[in-house]
Amino acid sequence: MRCLNMIMAEPPGLITICLLGYLLGADCTVFLDHEDATKVLSRPKRYNSGKLEEFVQGNLERECMEEKCSFEEAREVFENTEKTTEFWKQYVDGDQCESNPCLNGGICKDDINSYECWCQTGFEGKNCELDVTCNIKNGRCKQFCKLDADNKVVCSCTTGYQLAEDQKSCEPAVPFPCGRVSVPHISTTHTRAETLFLNMDYENSTTDYENSAEAEKNVDNVTQPLNDLTRIVGGKTAKPGQFPWQVLLKGKIDAFCGGSIINEKWVVTAAHCINPDVEITVVAGEHNTEETEHTEQKRNVIRTILHHSYNASVNKYSHDIALLELDEPLTLNSYVTPICVADREYTNTFLKFGYGYVSGWGKVFNKGRPATILQYLKVPLVDRATCLRSTKFTIYNNMFCAGFHEGGKDSCQGDSGGPHVTEVEGINFLTGIISWGEECAMKGKYGIYTKVSRYVNWIKEKTKLT
C-alpha cells in the first residue's frame, strides 16, 4: 500500500523506479503465500449421483463428465473392456432399466437404446411376460410335458421312445416304436408339433366336449343314424407301409371293418363291428386285398372286450369301442407297427390340433363298392356346435365330428372301426375311431367318430399298455 501512495504523489521518473521494484519483488507485497493461494484456487469436488457413480475413478471425471468423451477415452480410464462397456451403455443414453421393465422376477441389463431381460425359469419374452411352462407351447416339449416339484418343465415321451440330447425331442428306443412310419420311401412329416403347440391355447384345448351345455343329452334319448356300417370317399391311395397300424377285420367270407394295432397282442375297433356269431380274423400288414404282398400277418381273435358302457339295444354307437385279443403276437416290422396311445389329456389336446388322418378299405363312393387298396383322407375337426346342427341324430359327448361341409370326402361303409390319427412331430397318436354317419360324403354332413380320449385308461388297463 505504501508503494501505491508513492506512485500517486511522486513524478513520473519515480513511478518507473517503483514499478521496477514491484516486478523484482521489492517492498510491494502483491503475491499471496502458498497456503492462502491454495485456498483461493481450490473448488468443491463434483458429486456424481446415480448409478454412474460406481464407475467414476481415475480421470473419468475429467475425461467424460466435464466434456463428452469417446469409448476409447473411457477405456483408458477403466483399462477393462467389460467394465467400459457396462459404463458406456448408461453413459450414452441413460439407464433403460430404471423403470424396471422385466416381469416375473426377471433381471434387467441395460443396453444402448434398449435393454435385455434375463428371465426366471418358466418365463420368456421381451419382458419375461410369457409363461413357458406346460400351459404355453407345451414347455417346448415335442410330446409330453409336466412340472416337477420346483415348477420346472420336464419333458417325456410315449412308450418306445426316449428323450433326445436336447431333453425336448423324442427318439426311438426300440426298432419299431409306435406311431412311426419306417418304410424308407414314405415321407412321414405332415405337420410339426412345435407349430401346432405354438398356435394352440393349451389350457382351453384340454376342455372336453362334456363341459358343453349342448353335450348334456340323456343317453336314453335313442335315435339311430341311417347308416349301419357307415363310416373313404374322395381319398388317396396309400402306399405300402404308410399306415402300418391299420388292420382289416374279416369274417369267413368278406372283410367288414377296420381296426388299429395297440400292441403285439391287441387291436382296437368299433364295438358295433362285433357280431358274437362271427369268427374274426385280423389281417395286419395288408395293402391290396386282391394280391398277396408277403407283408400280411393273419391272426385269429380269441377274446373280444366291449366297453362296459356299450349297449347296442340302447344305442348302437354310444361308447362304440371294443378290444380284440389275438391268438399269437404280431411280429412288428415296417408294415406292422402299433399306433401310439397318449393319456386322456394329451389325446384330447392332439385331437384339437384340428386335422387327423383316417384310413380304410371302405366304399370309395356312396353306395359304391369297397376299395381293394388302402385309402386315406385328411379330415378337419368340426366344432361341436356345427356338428350338432348338422344332424337330427344324437351326438353324445363321447363322439366328435370331422369332415368337409361341402361334401365329396368322407369315411364310408366298411371303414368302421378304423383309426383317426393325429401326427405329432412325425409320430402318430390314436385320437378317434371311425363310427357312423348319414350316407357318405353328403354336403352338410360329417363323419362321426368315437372320442378315444374318453377311453384311454380303459384301453391301457385291458391291454396292459404302459
Swiss-Prot record:
Glycosylation sites: T85, S99, T206, N221, T223, T230
Modified-residue entries ((3R)-3-hydroxyaspartate), positions: D110
Molecular function as annotated in GO: calcium ion binding; endopeptidase activity; serine-type endopeptidase activity
Residues covered by the Peptidase S1 domain: 232-464
Pfam families assigned: EGF (PF00008), FXa_inhibition (PF14670), Gla (PF00594), Trypsin (PF00089)
A Gene Ontology cellular-component term: extracellular space
Quaternary structure, from the entry: Heterodimer of a light chain and a heavy chain; disulfide-linked. Interacts (inactive and activated) with F11 (activated) in calcium-dependent manner. Interacts with SERPINC1.
Protein name: Coagulation factor IX
Organism classification: Eukaryota, Metazoa, Chordata, Craniata, Vertebrata
Name of encoding gene: F9
